[in-house]
Amino acid sequence: MSGIRADGTGDVGLIIAVKRLGAAKTRLAPVFSAAARESVVLAMLMDTLTAAARVGDLRSITVITPDESAAAAATELGAEVLADPTRQGDPDPLNNAILTAEQVVSGSVPNIVVLQGDLPAMQTQELADAICAARAHQRSFVADRLGTGTAALCAFGSALDPQFGPDSSARHRRSGAVELTGAWPGLRCDVDTPADLAAARSLGVGPATARVVAHHR
């Protein structure tokens, strides 16, 4: 049994894909230096993993990343880590990384959820409720708070067929995935911009993100 959960009672494998920290969240540049952005991204990942780890339906959590710091943090929190083999210059690196992880994770669980790694305000119960709702559909997704992106993609007994990228919410909808309509404000609040971070902080972020943001403000 690998992954962040050790009891083996769940039937869902969670995947989080993380790019190199130095290339992440460039739209936070108006409020954070490059080094500070790396710290913020890592802290958000840690808070996301910590909240997700308490979801009883999860058998495992897998982080796929080319970044050594992200891999080390995920390992310390008990997640399975896969080295992202996606080549530099790949035209679709995020979806290809997810597909690589899906090939591995699907060997041990029948159901897979892909979650963004920048959800510092996500509550455990929000993710648990979304997974419960997703069980009614082969493929489903949770849109972000703006309705244009995707916070989570769920596949129950089906291939993921990830469509992340610009306007991913519409792309997932067109691909046949059902949009889940629960409120789940923390689950929907991924952080790409200063406005996103302000929204997450208004909901209440996890301790790692709170510490790092306070240190760099």
From Swiss-Prot:
Pathway: Cofactor biosynthesis; coenzyme F420 biosynthesis. GO terms for biological process: F420-0 metabolic process. It holds the Pfam family CofC. Keywords: GTP-binding, Nucleotide-binding, Nucleotidyltransferase, Transferase. Phosphoenolpyruvate binds at T150, G165, S168. GO terms for molecular function: GTP binding; phospholactate guanylyltransferase activity. InterPro entries: CofC, Nucleotide-diphossugar_trans. The keyword Nucleus does not apply. It catalyses: phosphoenolpyruvate + GTP + H(+) = enolpyruvoyl-2-diphospho-5'-guanosine + diphosphate. Guanylyltransferase that catalyzes the activation of phosphoenolpyruvate (PEP) as enolpyruvoyl-2-diphospho-5'-guanosine, via the condensation of PEP with GTP. It is involved in the biosynthesis of coenzyme F420, a hydride carrier cofactor. Belongs to the CofC family. This is Phosphoenolpyruvate guanylyltransferase. The gene is fbiD.
